Amino acid sequence: MRRYLAVRGGAGDVAEPDLNAKPQDNLYLAVNSEWLSKAEIPADQTSAGVNTELDIKIEKRMMKDFADIASGKEKMPDIRDFDKAIALYKIAKNFDKRDAEKANPIQNDLQKILDLINFDKFKDNATELFMGPYALPFVFDVDADMKNTDFNVLHFGGPSTFLPDTTTYKTPEAKKLLDILEKQSINLLEMAGIGKEEARVYVQNALAFDQKLSKVVKSTEEWSDYAAIYNPVSLTEFLAKFKSFDMADFLKTILPEKVERVIVMEPRFLDHADELINPANFDEIKGWMLVKYINSVAKYLSQDFRAAAFPFNQAISGTPELPSQIKQAYRLANGAFDEAVGIFYGKKYFGEEAKHDVEDMIHNMLKVYEQRINDNNWLSEDTKKKAIIKLRALVLKIGYPEKIEKIYDLLQIDPERSLYENEAQMATVRTKYMLDKLTQPVDRSVWLMPGNLNNACYDPQRNDLTFPAGILQAPFYDIHQSRGANYGGIGATIGHEVSHAFDNSGAKFDEHGNMNNWWTDEDFAEFNKRVGQMVDIFDGLQYGPAKINGKQVVGENIADLAGLACAVQAGKNDNVDLKDLFENYARSWMQKQRPEAIKTEVQVDVHAPQPTRVNIPVQCQDDFYTAFDVKPDDGMWLDPEDRITIW
């Protein structure tokens, strides 16, 4: 066992406050313990912390704006398709109408599943079901070809399981969670007009099919290997896997043109597809579709349905209360028209001065990154040159998009129809839009995140960075706070996203976003050795009631490590106070979570829990030891040979 395993992450438990903690022993607790000792988690949230507070701040602003615009107190902004968001919001917040409608809006669509009396009927109606608001026991998507990202291709995979991850089925909580889902689903089906005994049989069949799925679909750890989703097979080879279901006929009816090949995201699922999708399993498939359907649509119905669909989510998240009705109305409208809403937010709350300042910081960080690549002591010159070509090709998307994606023009809201009917109609439009992309080149101008989102991302297939206006505010960024604090906040975030271009997944893609090996064999072997060190230092780390899977979170941890290293270097170039930088970095990950939420996050998220993302990256920065005079006997000490450097 390596020495650092005793002290990785500092002394103490970052899930518990320690008012006596010193930065030399546990930076995260030294900075955040006072807040942790007093913080209360909102009743409708899974956590409290910097990110939650920022999410709530954005949401409160937008909810007031929506209320004022919907009431006529404020005029409708001149933003394309924003009026549709307000129209949907008005429908969603009318709970008098929703409560009066009860289960009526879903009866026709529910009946379409109930009318499936055998496997032949399922096959005959599969196209209509796929285009509607239903889950089928397989998934198709259209996205860029990883090896030629100018073109879209058809992707195939398995459906999601009832529990958050395949690993959840092996935990002591699995039976309790499935029992809650069983009771909830029977109740919902009864509320929709199905007899109790009939509902019970449907749900038991659904649970049986879900167990079969859980053995063949990918876990979160497997999904974290991004390049492993690229498994192209010929159409002939793909169709040969389906003996019982007429996949050839199905694809003819849903696709705008014939495809020559399919990208199989889950080869194991495809190998078992015929064992799952066949006449012998029909009753289980039908039950599974009903349970998926009723649990997904309950949120569009009455308050009674909303409440009846809450226990399973409550058990997974620990959240004691449903979001308020008005909050749900805003969230549904924002979710359906997020790009228009994000443009509204960006134009109103994100100033040009701030945008230019952030752009300046990003360009500074890119210069630092290039210098760090040049100074790298384990890469060959050939690989360095190619890494810099990729770095210089990065496309920046800051604040909010200038144009709205075409899909929002196609979505229509009918104020005379129910909330469910509007949502179902939009689901059909989105599915058709997705399939139609097969005949079109990849649109690289599309944003993956709306302007009002508190987040940021790197897209390996477009080689672009997105920094929405939502994250470009305190404590991550404030034009009035110290430059050191800004580098510890948004600077580290910028470095983090840039580093995704060179993490264990991004490193396999070139400057055009194509999966293409631009490394020498020797360099890639050394890179993978360092990736392995990153896996080891996090693997098994205890956080509250859960242990971290180092392999599952390694890509994000590489980005954290390299992002902070770049922020420190950029800060030094600007002569900032490094204590400010490290302390704001620790503050930016401040969080208090419910135990249930921790367990679920560790199972399903490729990010380590936020508090665990502070001390280990900091421990690997030599400048931290100088800034805080850290000694070998201190809890934050790592021996120099155990400090990991990748970029």
Swiss-Prot record:
Q: Which GO terms describe its biological process?
A: protein processing
Tell me the active site: 497, 560 (proton donor)
Q: Where is the Peptidase M13 domain?
A: 1-647
**A GO CC term attached to the entry:** plasma membrane
Which keywords does this chain's UniProt record carry? Answer: Hydrolase, Metal-binding, Metalloprotease, Protease, Zinc
Under the heading Gene3D superfamilies, the entry gives:
Collagenase (Catalytic Domain), Neutral endopeptidase , domain2
Concerning InterPro entries, the annotation shows: MetalloPept_cat_dom_sf (IPR024079), Peptidase_M13 (IPR000718), Peptidase_M13_C (IPR018497), Peptidase_M13_dom_2 (IPR042089), Peptidase_M13_N (IPR008753)
Q: Where, if anywhere, are coiled coils annotated?
A: none
Q: Quote the record's binding site residues for Zn(2+).
A: 496, 500, 556
Give the EC number(s) under which this enzyme is classified: 3.4.24.-
Picking any one GO molecular function of the record gives: metalloendopeptidase activity
Enzyme class, first EC level, given as a word: hydrolase
Similarity comment text for this entry: Belongs to the peptidase M13 family.
Protein name per the record: Neutral endopeptidase
Q: Which species does the entry assign this protein to?
A: Lactobacillus helveticus
Source gene?
Answer: pepO
